């Protein structure tokens, strides 16, 4: 009788040795092709392209063996003849390195530091010697359990609760940290949960049972004030709830925890404890305001994200404070840069109330040097020398505004995150990090060849700031799994910081671990007062239709729109983004220009860049020049419309719906997109959406069901997919409705601001609690980070030239 038996998992080296002996000639043929490319780096798609060029018979032999598996998992190949080194990623977050001598067919397995040293020879011609600074954060987390399953990535708080609840509640003695936390928890000197009448865990359980018994005798709606004095006498303060029913639920949750600890119950209980009253959100760069700024340099989705986030957060904070029976007024402050030269915006105003809120404001603090306040806009790539002084100034302003410390500091993007790290360190406050986009992923090979890009982008400074912030923070929220750990075939933004090198500066052998429980996926949504389905006719903003008609179809060409649409009966494919290389708007225009069938089926409308004024952004200037060239090369006038960036979000919402009325589609063609807010906006309006497979949109959209994935590196295939869709719709119009409805359903399930704000506040409570009762504040690594900041980051920041006024 056959029996199942466990077999040893062979190492990468063993598997390769077996394949080498079986398929020596085929492997030699492929590696010789790769070596023949000469000194340099081949990305995953280039390695696969070389593989596809070898004879089919050889290809088939390799496909089924261990070498085929290695090849499919290879993210990059380093060629330094006669050696070829491979960075192999069998699954997200797991890396192995090897190199092969093509002439001798000798295989060596490398450690990360050895691989990086080999890679550095591309730049230096020889290694930097034995005394290069190597950064390794792994020892600081070695004693702390970490998940190993892919499904745990981005679910850090669940893992943390499972591990620490078992540890914390295993006997009476271990309950003292919880008791201390509940006794010390206060706001503005007022104790919120327990007073000093409760001295030990036994007394706590006794009091909770006594309170439970009493609450069972009063009507559920009885206000807390009716029994406040009675509860205070036995040791309970007023943070348990606003009425008898709510207080009873909270008490029973804690009793359940003390009886039989459970991670879900723990999270629910901690989510009820009122911990967050003052929130500070940092976003220094760009033009941060509520009107007339979208489309300005460095000003796009991040501004929209934060404003929507703040409205949702304030609502949830008010709701929770009320439910817990407290009369505390929350505050949310968005900290950004004050721009004296505000260029027709409110960016020169110190304090500005956030529309649609009661207690949230934008607080602007200027950049300052020893010569005074910096007046002009500065690119996000050049802010580094100002941020340390800026942090001190922000701390001073916060003390004035809040009359105390915030409960949560949220950083946004690289500059906001390093300021958040410095502030959280100074004030001892829980820190949350939101990257939005890590530039190292957006600019391939920007680490190894950083010196070539340094004058323009100062990536050495930015990557150092990113590494510092992601290791300093208490928790990181991302919009998608891909942002953390990519997909089967692509590397995640954070994952790309696992091991990398900046030759001549430092070598990162362990920068971040994507399995770290600090990672949590919390996806945002679109503002549903602005973005709603085109079929909701009673809500449609018809007052904008004349203006939108002018934008899309006017025969006039001016600074706001050029080129005309001659056939108004055709559906419109539409895109809206900043005009930069990564957003790849000119790429979409080129795909369209080259595909005669697509041009026959649909018109193309692009909202990008601002032709009404001269851009200060070098990338935008280059992309504008390219756009004019494409219009001329492909004779696009008549089928194409280029509209300057549109600042009015409310009208933009109706613009999406008007495009949907034409039975068109939204296309997001970015080379890489961290999340894809415009994708969510378009889908929320019911517009079928085609979006990049690189980054967040790959998770937002279920391919072929709620939209379509496109590969920006294969524009011809993307254009063919659009042709296929519109030809199908021509034959069967219900196909358009089917994709539209599935997109709407997908948004309702996962991408709303209400879900987001509930999750963010719960995470803050959980991580704040664990910091108090455990060693989760990572003191050892923070001392290491202080040294890294002082000895590396500060010098790099000082090397960035100050702006010329």
From Swiss-Prot:
One of its GO terms (biological process) is sucrose metabolic process. It is an enzyme of class 2 (transferase). Gene3D superfamilies: 1.20.120.1230, 3.10.450.330, Glycogen Phosphorylase B. It catalyses: an NDP-alpha-D-glucose + D-fructose = a ribonucleoside 5'-diphosphate + sucrose + H(+). Its EC number is 2.4.1.13. Residues 275-752 are annotated as: GT-B glycosyltransferase. It holds the Pfam family SUS_EPBD. SUPFAM superfamilies: UDP-Glycosyltransferase/glycogen phosphorylase. GO terms for molecular function: sucrose synthase activity. InterPro entries: Glyco_trans_1, Sucrose_synth_GT-B1, Sucrose_synthase_pln/cyn, SUS_EPBD, SUS_N. The keyword Ribosomal protein does not apply. Belongs to the glycosyltransferase 1 family. Plant sucrose synthase subfamily. PANTHER family: PTHR45839, SUCROSE SYNTHASE (PTHR45839:SF31). This is Sucrose synthase. It comes from Vigna radiata var. radiata. The lineage of its organism: Eukaryota, Viridiplantae, Streptophyta, Embryophyta, Tracheophyta. The gene is SS1.
């Amino acid at each position: 009788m056959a029996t199942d038996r466990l077999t040893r998992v062979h190492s990468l080296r063993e598997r390769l040795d077996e394949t080498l002996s079986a398929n020596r000639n085929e492997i030699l043929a492929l590696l010789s092709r790769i070596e023949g490319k000469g000194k340099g780096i081949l990305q995953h798609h280039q390695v696969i392209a070389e593989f596809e060029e070898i004879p089919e018979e050889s290809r088939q032999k390799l496909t089924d063996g261990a070498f085929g598996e290695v090849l499919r998992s290879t993210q990059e190949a380093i060629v330094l003849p006669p050696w070829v080194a491979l960075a192999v990623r069998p699954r997200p977050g797991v890396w192995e390195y090897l190199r092969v001598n093509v002439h001798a067919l000798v295989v060596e397995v490398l450690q990360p530091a050895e691989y990086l040293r080999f890679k550095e020879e591309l730049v230096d011609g020889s290694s930097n010697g034995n005394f290069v600074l190597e950064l390794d954060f792994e020892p600081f987390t070695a004693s702390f359990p970490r998940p190993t399953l892919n499904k745990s990535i981005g679910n850090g708080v669940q893992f943390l609760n499972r591990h620490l609840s078992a540890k914390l509640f295993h006997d009476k003695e271990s309950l003292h940290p919880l008791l201390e936390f509940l006794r010390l928890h206060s706001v503005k000197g007022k104790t919120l949960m327990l007073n000093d009448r409760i001295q030990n865990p036994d007394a706590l359980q006794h009091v909770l049972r006594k309170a439970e018994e009493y609450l069972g005798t009063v009507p559920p709606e009885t206000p807390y004030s009716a029994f406040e004095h009675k509860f205070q006498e036995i040791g309970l303060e007023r943070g348990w709830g606003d009425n008898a029913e709510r207080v009873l639920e909270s008490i029973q949750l804690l009793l359940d925890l003390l009886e039989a600890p459970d991670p879900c119950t723990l999270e629910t209980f901690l989510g009820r404890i009122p911990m967050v009253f003052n929130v500070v959100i940092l976003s220094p760069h760009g033009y941060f305001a509520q009107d007339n700024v979208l489309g300005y340099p460095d000003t796009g989705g991040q501004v929209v994200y934060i404003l929507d986030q703040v409205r949702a957060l304030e609502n949830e904070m008010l709701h929770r404070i009320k439910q817990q029976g407290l009369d505390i007024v929350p505050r949310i402050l968005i900290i950004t840069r004050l721009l004296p030269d505000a260029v027709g915006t409110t960016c020169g105003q110190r304090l500005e109330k956030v529309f649609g809120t009661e207690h949230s404001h934008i607080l602007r603090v200027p950049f300052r040097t020893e010569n005074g306040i910096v007046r002009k806009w500065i690119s996000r790539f050049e802010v580094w020398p100002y941020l340390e002084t800026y942090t001190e100034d922000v701390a001073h302003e916060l003390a004035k505004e809040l009359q105390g410390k915030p409960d949560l500091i949220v950083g946004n993007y690289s500059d906001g995150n390093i300021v958040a790290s410095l502030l959280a360190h100074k004030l001892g406050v829980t820190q949350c990090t939101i990257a939005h986009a890590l530039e190292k992923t957006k600019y391939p090979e920007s680490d190894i060849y950083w010196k070539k890009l340094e004058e323009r982008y100062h990536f050495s400074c930015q990557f150092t700031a990113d590494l510092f912030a992601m290791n300093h923070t208490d928790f990181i929220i991302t919009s998608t799994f891909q942002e953390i750990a990519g997909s089967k075939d692509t590397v995640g933004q954070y994952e790309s910081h696992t091991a990398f090198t900046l030759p001549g500066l430092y070598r990162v052998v362990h920068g971040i671990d994507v399995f770290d429980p600090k990672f949590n996926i919390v996806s945002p949504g679109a503002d549903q007062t602005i973005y709603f389905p085109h079929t909701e006719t009673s809500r449609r903003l018809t007052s904008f239709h004349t203006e939108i008609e002018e934008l899309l179809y006017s025969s006039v060409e001016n600074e706001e729109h050029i080129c005309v649409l001659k056939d108004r009966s055709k559906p419109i494919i539409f895109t809206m983004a900043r005009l930069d290389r990564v957003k790849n708007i000119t790429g979409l225009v080129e795909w369209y220009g080259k595909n005669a069938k697509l041009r026959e089926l649909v018109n193309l409308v692009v909202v990008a860049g601002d032709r009404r004024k001269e851009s200060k952004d070098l990338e935008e200037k280059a992309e504008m020049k390219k756009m004019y060239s494409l219009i001329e090369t492909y004779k696009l006038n008549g089928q194409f419309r280029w509209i300057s960036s549109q600042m009015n979000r409310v009208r933009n919402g109706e613009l999406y719906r008007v495009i949907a009325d034409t039975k068109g589609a939204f296309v997001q063609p970015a080379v890489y997109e961290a999340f894809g807010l415009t994708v969510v906006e378009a889908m929320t309006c019911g517009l079928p959406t085609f979006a990049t497979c690189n980054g967040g949109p790959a998770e937002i959209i279920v391919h072929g069901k709620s939209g379509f994935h496109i590969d920006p590196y294969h524009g011809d295939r993307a254009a063919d997919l659009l042709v296929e869709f519109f030809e199908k719709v021509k034959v069967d119009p219900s196909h358009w409705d089917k994709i539209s409805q599935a997109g709407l359903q997908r948004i309702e399930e996962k991408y709303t601001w209400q879900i987001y704000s509930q999750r963010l506040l719960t995470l803050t409570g959980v991580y704040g609690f664990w910091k108090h009762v455990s060693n989760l504040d990572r003191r050892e690594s923070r001392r290491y980070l202080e040294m890294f900041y002082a000895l590396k980051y500060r010098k790099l920041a000082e090397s960035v030239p100050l702006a010329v006024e």
